[in-house]
Every structure is written in structure tokens, then in C-alpha cells.
């Protein structure tokens, strides 16, 4: 079920109802930290905007590097679905750069937030810039983890395939490293008592297991 639909140039953005689960988690964390309601709502909106920029960077990279356009972007709690007008025929470094585009966009947003942070002259601007910086750093770094379904996992798999020239061997190494990262994430979620990190760890372990579908 969609809760919001709008267009960014030729791309139709559809935000799924499940995104509210992520917002519920943020409200829970904000309640634990004793934040004001307006602070939590602001963080939710900044996060939503940052995720949209992340996914639109992928859409732009698909178009510029692979010549493939997407007219729809479906944003849900586990990430985004980007239906393409045709399947890409090339993989290798170009595909890896498409995967890198999202995290890179978040890190660039974090840099811009730092600039605003340094130049800010009032507390409201300072808080907004700080929140934006922290959220974008988390999004960028998390997605650089070399484990599918994170962008870093897709990038790592594509670069391995380009380097080794043997798709099955590259996939084996990518799954092995990805599974190890999933186990480390699971341990981190246990010690930090972070259920969302635990869900990310489970997604990582599943995406890199022999039971999941072939290469992503």
C-alpha cells in the first residue's frame, strides 16, 4: 500500500506503507533518548530525504553509466525497488559504480551538512545540520559494508568478478565475505541491543546464503 506518490523529473516516487515501521523505530529510539517529538519528526523527515537522494543517485547512475532508465522508484522499509526498462547486459566496474552512487551521495550530503554546521549561527540550524550529518554518515558507511544486500556487497561482487574473470568463483568469495559481515553485524546488534541492526544482519545472512537466488 502506497502512502505518498510524487514525481522527480521523469521518475515516479512511490513510498510504501512499511516505511512507517522505520519511523516507529526512530520514535522508539527518540523516546529512549528523551528527545522532543518535533526533534524525532525532523529526524524522520531528514532520513526520508536522505534515503530518497541515495536511491535517486542509483537511478541517475543507471541512466548515465548503463544507459538504462527507470520511471518508477518504490521506497519501502527494507530499501528501494527500481524497476528498469531493460535488464543490464554489462556488469563489472560500471555496475559497481552504480552501487557506489548511493553511498557516495549520502557522504556528499554529510560533507554539505558539516559546512552548514560550521557556518551556522543559531541552534536550530546547528541541530538540523548535525542530525543530517550523522544520518547521512550512517547511511553511507552502512551501505559500504561488503555484504549483499547492501550496496557495498553488490560493488564488492562486481569488482571481484571483474578482477577474477570467473563469475562463480567471484560469487563464492562475495558470499563468504558477505556472510562473515552478516555474523559481525549480528554480534554488534546483540551487544548494542539494536533490533534494526539485527534485521540488517539477517538480511545479509539470507542474501549471501546458498538458498538465496543467484547473483544480484
Regions found by a protein language model. Name each.
Residues 1-216:
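Hydrophobic transmembrane alpha-helices and their immediate loop junctions
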Amino acid at each position: 500500500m502506497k502512502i505518498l506518490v510524487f514525481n522527480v523529473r521523469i521518475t515516479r516516487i512511490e513510498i510504501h506503507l512499511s516505511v512507517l515501521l522505520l519511523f516507529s523505530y526512530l520514535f522508539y529510539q527518540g523516546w529512549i533518548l528523551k528527545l522532543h517529538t518535533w526533534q524525532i519528526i525532523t529526524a524522520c523527515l531528514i532520513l526520508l530525504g536522505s534515503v530518497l537522494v541515495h536511491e535517486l543517485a542509483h537511478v541517475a547512475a543507471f541512466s548515465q553509466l548503463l544507459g538504462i532508465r527507470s520511471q518508477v522508484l518504490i521506497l519501502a522499509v527494507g530499501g528501494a525497488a527500481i524497476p528498469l526498462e531493460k535488464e543490464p547486459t554489462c556488469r563489472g566496474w560500471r555496475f559497481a559504480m552504480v552501487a557506489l552512487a548511493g553511498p557516495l551521495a549520502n557522504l556528499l550530503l554529510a560533507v554539505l551538512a558539516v559546512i552548514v554546521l560550521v557556518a551556522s549561527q543559531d541552534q536550530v540550524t546547528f541541530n538540523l545540520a548535525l542530525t543530517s550529518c550523522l544520518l547521512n554518515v550512517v547511511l553511507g558507511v552502512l551501505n559500504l559494508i561488503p555484504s549483499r544486500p547492501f550496496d557495498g556487497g553488490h560493488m564488492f561482487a562486481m569488482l571481484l568478478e571483474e578482477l577474477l574473470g570467473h563469475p562463480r568463483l567471484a560469487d563464492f568469495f562475495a558470499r563468504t565475505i558477505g556472510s562473515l559481515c552478516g555474523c559481525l553485524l549480528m554480534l554488534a546488534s546483540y551487544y548494542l541491543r539494536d533490533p534494526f541492526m539485527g534485521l540488517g544482519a539477517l538480511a545479509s545472512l539470507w542474501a549471501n546464503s546458498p538458498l538465496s537466488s543467484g547473483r544480484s
